[in-house]
Amino acid sequence: DAKKVIDSIDTYFRENEIENGRINIAGGEPLMYRRLDDIIDYIAEKNINISIITNGALLTEERIAAWSGKVAMIGISIDAINADADIHIGRCDALKNTNDLEHLIRMAKAIHKAGIKLKINTVVSKANLDEDMLSVYEALKPDRLKLIYIHVVHNVNEWPETMDLIPTVGEYNQFVEKNRYEENCELVLERPMEMENSYFMINPHGEVYINCFGLEKKYGNSIYEPLSEIFSRLPFDKKKFDLRYEDETI
């Protein structure tokens, strides 16, 4: 199904003469998918830009080197350097193992060496307000840094423990100012209202869905219906999207 989804995206790009279209592979954790490298090769053969969002735990220097010339950007999600904060947020495995900063620093160096752009995503919540993330960003040297206000999708993750993690707008702004990193780096701030209706996702089974007014809603399946027809039904806010990505080069 994944290749059929890619074919549908490729058709949409060609029909609409989109020359710099990009497929962003996210999850879950995409590096757990055993056929990921086959999928990357398949997308690359179609000359579509590729980006990957990962927690970085399964990255290796060898894999990064093999992606050189195929993957344009690797995004690493890192919300905290304190193990307790990571566990509170949920960034740990079943044995409560959390990410290793030294490993991420090595991977960041490998990404830069491979000529791949590095992006860092941090979700800002009550659990990491006191974290010194600036030192992490200085060590990783990202080309792009996105600070994301924790987002609640009411029919997906509206649990008491999630609601308890929501910071005030003032707390979010304080986190941004304390951890602002802009050394040869594009800083992007993403707040809840800026995310709603401004991006869509396609799962491996072809289902197209969007975050609409705080709810995750499905609008069709790209394997069985042209994306152009599905997009015509989406409550997609292109102005919001353009504002988020007008200066994006990676």
Could you say what each language-model-derived stretch is?
Residues 1-52, 58-65:
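Conserved alpha-helical substructure of the radical SAM core
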Residues 4, 8-9, 71-82:
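Short, compositionally biased "basic patch" segments
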Residues 10-17, 66-71, 113, 137-141:
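Acidic (Asp/Glu)-rich catalytic clusters
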Residues 21-25, 50-52, 74-76, 118-122, ...:
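Hydrophobic faces of well-ordered beta-strands that scaffold small-molecule active sites
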Residues 21-25, 199-206:
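N-terminal pre-triad scaffold of radical SAM enzymes
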Residues 32, 60, 126-130, 230:
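Alpha-helix N-cap/loop-to-helix initiation residues
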Residues 79, 83-197, 204, 209, ...:
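Radical SAM enzyme [4Fe-4S]-AdoMet core and its adjacent flexible, acidic
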Residues 232-250:
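Cysteine/selenocysteine-centered motifs that mediate thiol-based redox chemistry or coordinate metal-sulfur cofactors
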